[in-house]
Structures are given as structure tokens and as C-alpha cells.
Amino acid sequence: MGDILFSSPQSMFSHTMNKNSILHTHSIIGKTFFSEIGIGISGNSFLLLVHILKFIRGHRPRLTDLPIGLLSLIHLLMLLVAAFIATDIFISRRGWDDIICKFLVYLYRVLRGFSLCTTSMLSILQAIILSPRSSCLAKFKHISPHHISGAILFLSVLYMLIGSQLLVSIIATPNLTMNDFIYVTQSCSILPLSYLMQSIYSTLLAIREFFLISLMVLSNWYMVALLSMHRKQTQHLHGTNLSPKKSPEQSATQTILMLISFFLLMTIYDTIVSCSRTMFLNDPTSYSIELFIMHIYATVSPFVFMSTEKHIVNFLRSLGKRVINFNLH
């Protein structure tokens, strides 16, 4: 108290400037985050609508149509929940109670788990599509959507069970006076776990992430090997001077490969940051930046998937030409 009473005007001015700078930075991050969420919601809504129309019109579904359509729905719901949670981070405290905190945060984590499991399944299915007829994976090319849905549901249930400790550890904290709490929003925090419980949870979390990431890494490696082998065979048949024309499946595979590789980096980053926040950090600004980075995949993915759909690209081009012609007239 004495330090505050007898502090110099310069130090008080410096403290005020630092506080204003932090608030300004927080405001910029918030505006950027909500812009990201808006773009992601628009993209996923459009992609979901496209897949619904394809289903209604009776188009023959491809092996990857179900997981891509499901991903758009998952990401749409996840971004909506994230936007609602973010209002308690960037705008104002809503005074949520324990039930609301547990419901929102756990629902958000469940949707993120669905995203991880569905992306893992998508990488496996894309590897199956690319596999040659002589491959042992070729027999799975005619797998039914029911089996795909069952596999995604099984992985998601395992993911939910391991993360169910959040239902106990998430609480409403109207007044953050203890440093032991881990910041989630202005109204919600995570209770610190004992060393034993933290060790058990971290081990289960590591096993879960390692299993799903391993599936994606193996399928990605398999697809890269197949693409490389096909390129060498084509160059051998047609000569090195001619650039071989890519099939639609190969172009789609390369695009999905880049997207899944990016998702892998984001997942590894999220795991590292989550563990470090649990053990060392509790900074709302760092947490806000982490939130922005974590949602890049959900925001970018629908546009990447749409770029592989020739009929969507043609539709958007024709729509753009109509808008330009309308403005000219």
C-alpha cells in the first residue's frame, strides 16, 4: 500500500500506459479473432449447404464426402460455440455459473475432439482412394458410410471419455484471487489438479494425441509414397521433358495432404501450449493469441475443400462474372 501512496507520477503514468497498451492489444486480438470466426462460419456454412444439396439430389457419394461434410458441420458448431465463449474473454464478464461453464467448455472440447477424429479418418480414406488395386487397402474402397460413421463415432467417444475430467475441474470463478486457477474466460477457470491426477491425465492425453496423430502421419506418408511412385512411373513412360498431367484424385490428394499436414502442426502446437499453460503460464493475452491460432484450421479448411471441387469452383466463377456484369450495367 505504501508503494502505491508514495510512487512517483512518472511510475504511475508508466503503469497507466502499460495498462492501456495491454487493453489496446487485447482489443485488436479480439477484433481479429471475431473476424476469423465470421469467415470460418461463412465458409463452413456454404460447404455444408453444398453437401446437403448433393445428398438431396442423389449424387453418388465419394468415400471422402461424408467426413468432409461432417467436418464442415463440426467446425460450424465449434466456431459458433467459440464465438459465444469469446464474448466472455474479449467483451464483458457474463457471470456464468458452474453449469454454464462446464457445458460450454466441455462442448467446445468435444467438438474439437470430433474435428481431430474426423480429420484422422479423412486422411485414412484419402489414402484408401489413392491406393492401387493390388494394395491390401483396395478392398476398403467400397466401404459403406455407416461403417465410416461408426469408426468416427468410436474414436470420438474415446476422445470424450479421456477429456471427461473437465466436467469436474471447470468451475465458475467470479473473483480470480488465487494464482493456482488456470484462466479460461473471465467467468470460468480450471481447478488445479493434484500431481498424481495431473500425471495420469497428461499420460492419457499424450496417448490419445499420439494415436490419432500417428494415424494421420502414416496415411500421409503412404500417400506421399504413392504420389512419388506414380510420378516416377509417368516420367519413365513419357520422358522427363514432359510434365505429366495430374488426375483429379491426385490433385485432391495433394491439397488434402497440405491441409492435414497443417492440421498436424496445429494439433502438436495446441498440445504443447495446453500442457505449458497447465504447468507454467496463466496469461490471458497469450491465451487469446493461442485461441486465434487454434481456429485457423477450422476457418481455412472449407475453402481448401471447395477448391478441390470443380463444380463449386465453376459455380463461384460464373457467380463472380454475373456480379461483375451486373455492376457494369
From Swiss-Prot:
Q: Which domain of life is it from?
A: Eukaryota
For this chain, the family text in UniProt reads: Belongs to the G-protein coupled receptor 1 family.
Any single GO BP term = sensory perception of chemical stimulus
GO CC annotation: plasma membrane
Q: Where is the signal peptide?
A: none
GO: which molecular function terms? pheromone receptor activity
Give the bilayer topology.
Answer: Multi-pass membrane protein
Query: Where are the Extracellular topological domains?
Result: 1-32, 87-109, 172-209, 276-285
The phenotype of cells or organisms lacking this gene is: Mice lacking all but one V1ra and V1rb gene (12% of the V1r repertoire) show a lack of chemosensory response to a subset of known pheromonal ligands and changes in maternal aggression as well as male reproductive behavior.
Q: Which Pfam families match?
A: V1R
Q: What is this protein called?
A: Vomeronasal type-1 receptor 42
